[in-house]
């Protein structure tokens, strides 16, 4: 770092009992290159905040296992684009709540199978 430059990088190691911590600060950019495997295990919680744009690209397979629950909150639009096919399997019930309009577009064939009962309620025009 030059004499007149402000800002700094920091690496701190603390071994104080019950306050053990490794702290890393990059004043500007932080890059990692792992030429083989990268394994991470967190025995408690993980929190991340990204103040800008978050991009992630996975060139092969992405597998995610969640043992309890998953909540996703999106403040604006949400788009899912699948190149080939998409299957959704729900063990018990599935509910879709739409605030205004719901549209389904099928380019060719559509099939619906109901094992027992089907009820349709229309509040106004048919």
Regions found by a protein language model. Name each.
Residues 1-126:
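Structural signature for extended repeat/solenoid scaffolds and their inter-repeat hinge/linker regions
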């Amino acid at each position: 770092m030059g004499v007149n430059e402000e800002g700094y990088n920091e690496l701190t190691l603390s071994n104080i009992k019950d306050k053990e911590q490794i702290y890393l600060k990059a004043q500007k950019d932080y890059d990692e290159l792992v030429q083989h495997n990268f394994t991470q295990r967190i025995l408690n919680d993980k929190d991340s905040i990204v103040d800008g744009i978050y991009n992630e690209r996975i060139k092969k397979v992405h597998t995610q296992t969640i043992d309890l629950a998953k909540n996703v909150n999106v403040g604006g639009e949400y788009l899912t684009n699948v190149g080939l096919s998409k299957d959704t399997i729900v063990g018990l019930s599935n509910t879709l709540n739409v605030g205004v309009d719901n549209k389904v577009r099928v380019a060719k064939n559509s099939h619906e199978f109901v094992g027992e009962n089907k009820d349709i309620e229309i509040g106004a025009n048919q």
